[in-house]
């Protein structure tokens, strides 16, 4: 569940920091290391692929809400990733694309009126219909990415010392 205390500015700040932080954390890793999963964990490439799928799904929700959509159909990022080639892509190329897509999302978010973040939609397709706003999805995405940044940091540290 999302951190309910993050403000719009904090959400934007955290979303803006994700791609540069991944770049920083993985700078010393080789292409082989980026694809090397640790025990029972994903590789850095797997985490990036997952973050891209989540950003596709939740970023789309945010933009749709801000643009006034009355309803959304829920999409599970774990299902969405199966329709992509994200896991097979070169890490550096994929991260560069993620950074460009994030910049495009941030452009929309920065131009949105504060009230647009609180517009609600009905989300169907995941059980009982839910009422959600753009801030909910922004908080969810920011918190989710933060957890995976910690995962990448731990992974990179272990790989650099091995």
What are these regions (language model features)?
Residues 18, 81-119:
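Acidic/histidine-rich alpha-helical segments that form the ligand environment
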Residues 33-78, 120-162:
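Short, contiguous alpha-helical
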Residues 7-11, 90-95, 136-138:
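Active-site rim elements
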Residues 29-31:
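Extracellular-facing binding/remodeling surfaces
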Residues 19-27, 56-59, 63, 99-113, ...:
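Structural signal for well-ordered, non-membrane alpha-helices
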Residues 1-2, 78-86, 126-127:
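A short small-residue
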Residues 1-17:
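Extreme N-terminal tail/first-helix region
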Residues 12, 16-19, 41, 48, ...:
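Generic structural concept
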């Amino acid at each position: 569940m999302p951190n309910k205390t993050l403000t719009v500015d904090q959400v934007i700040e955290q979303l803006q920091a994700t791609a540069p932080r991944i770049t920083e954390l993985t700078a010393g890793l080789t292409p082989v290391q980026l694809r090397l999963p640790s025990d029972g964990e994903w590789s850095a490439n797997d985490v990036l692929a997952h973050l891209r799928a989540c950003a596709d799904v939740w970023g789309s929700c945010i933009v749709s809400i801000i643009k006034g959509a009355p309803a959304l159909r829920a999409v599970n990022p774990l299902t969405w990733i199966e329709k992509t080639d994200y896991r097979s892509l070169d890490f550096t190329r994929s991260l560069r694309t993620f950074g460009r897509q994030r910049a495009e999302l941030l452009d929309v978010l920065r131009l949105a009126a504060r009230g647009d973040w609180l517009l609600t939609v009905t989300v169907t397709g995941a059980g009982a219909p839910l009422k959600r706003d753009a801030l909910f999805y922004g908080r969810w995405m920011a918190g989710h990415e933060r957890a995976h940044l910690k995962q990448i940091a731990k992974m990179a540290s272990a790989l650099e010392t091995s």
